[in-house]
A protein has these predicted regions:
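Short secondary-structure boundary micro-motifs
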Residues: 19-23, 149-150, 219-221
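Generic marker of residues within folded, mature protein domains
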Residues: 26, 41, 143, 227-230, ...
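Acidic two-metal-ion nuclease catalytic site recognized across multiple nuclease folds
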Residues: 180-321
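Conserved non-catalytic scaffold segment of RNase H-like nuclease domains
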Residues: 2-108, 270-315
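Metal-dependent phosphoesterase core characteristic of DEDDh/y 3'-5' exonuclease domains
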Residues: 27-34, 38-69, 93-217, 282-288
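Short Asp/Glu-rich motifs
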Residues: 85, 172, 256
Length: 321
């Protein structure tokens, strides 16, 4: 049996202090601090990691960043490079582990910085991880609201014995919040970082959760090409695999950023399909995140209303022209 550790990671990064510097560099955010807590499979802390990093891209601290994290450039001048620190950090993580972060930005920026310095990729496709911010919402709120780490710490009445907004302290508090997740089923709600996209159709993600399915596509050159792909617009029932009958055809909202449909499975009833068009963070390609979710009659009515509202908005725009 594989024993997997949890790596509760937090990063702090600097950015350009002016527009000229920003335009002159392809790296938007330069990581200057890595903090992490390692938990075993029983969620007990077994180790920690913390190190500051010497900047190689931005040599002035962005004013807002400096005021938030209270790090001066002088503190970083004798530190090791990103390649050295990140390399040691990944060795420290070990072989069998899963990243846990507050929100999804840290994993994206870690991989962006690694690619900038020509380090090996963390994965060859979407990377499974736990978004503790999302899990907090599922455990204690409405699944949709996203709170700050400070809010969660206050809500759970966790002792605040160190300051926030440093990589080591925020990783520590994230681990403390995670220790208040008592239902094992909560950890069925994993997330995917999409810095690395599926390379081919065979690599695409099909993940089934309690009451919905998530699909992450390979890259496409544009939205039209994506919507012509059979797998993108497929609506097989995720519970039994049966073909479904279309009730509301795919229609777009938000200038083609989102698409909706309603289908019906003979066995499991109505399903709502939603397509989100996402732009790759690495190039100009787009990819699709599609969800299929069980709904009732009220859910069908909501989609019909949305479709009608979209028609009315488009009609009004045409009338203005």
């Amino acid at each position: 049996m594989i024993i997997m550790n949890y790596i509760l990671m937090d990063l702090e990064w600097n950015q350009a202090s002016d527009e000229k510097t920003k335009l002159a560099n392809e790296l938007l955010f330069e990581i200057i601090e890595i903090g992490a807590v390692k938990l075993n499979d029983k969620k007990h802390q077994i180790d920690s990691f913390h190190e500051l990093i010497k900047p190689q891209v931005f040599h002035r601290m962005n004013q807002v960043t400096g005021e938030l994290i209270h790090i001066q450039m002088e503190q970083l001048s004798n530190c090791r490079s990103f390649e050295e620190v990140a390399g040691d950090f990944l060795k420290w993580c070990g072989e069998d582990y899963v990243f846990c972060t507050w929100g999804g930005a840290d994993l994206t920026e870690l991989q962006r910085n690694m690619e900038y310095y020509h380090m090996s990729s963390l994965s060859s496709g979407p990377l499974k991880y736990y978004d503790i911010q999302k899990l907090f919402s599922i455990a204690y709120e409405d699944r949709k609201t996203r709170r700050s780490l400070k809010y969660a710490v206050d809500y759970l009445e966790i002792e605040q014995d160190i300051a926030f907004h440093r990589a080591d302290s925020d990783a520590y508090y994230t681990a403390k919040v995670m220790s208040h997740f008592y239902n094992p089923a909560l950890f069925d709600n994993y997330s995917f970082d999409t810095y690395q996209l599926p390379k081919s159709r065979a690599d695409e993600v099909h993940a089934i959760f309690e009451n919905y399915e998530k699909y992450i596509s390979r890259p496409f050159p544009d939205k039209l090409t994506a919507m012509q792909d059979k797998e993108v617009i497929s609506t097989r029932c995720f519970l039994c695999g049966a073909n479904t009958k279309r009730r509301i055809p795919w229609f777009s909202v938000n200038n083609g950023k989102h698409y909706y449909t309603v289908v019906c499975c003979k066995t499991h009833g109505y399903l709502k399909g939603k397509i989100r068009m996402r732009k790759s963070v690495r190039d100009d390609c787009i990819y699709v995140v599609k969800t299929l979710k069980s709904i009732d009659e009220n859910g069908v009515t909501d989609i019909l209303k949305r479709k009608q509202q979209t028609r009315e908005v488009r009609k009004e725009r045409r009338h203005r022209l």
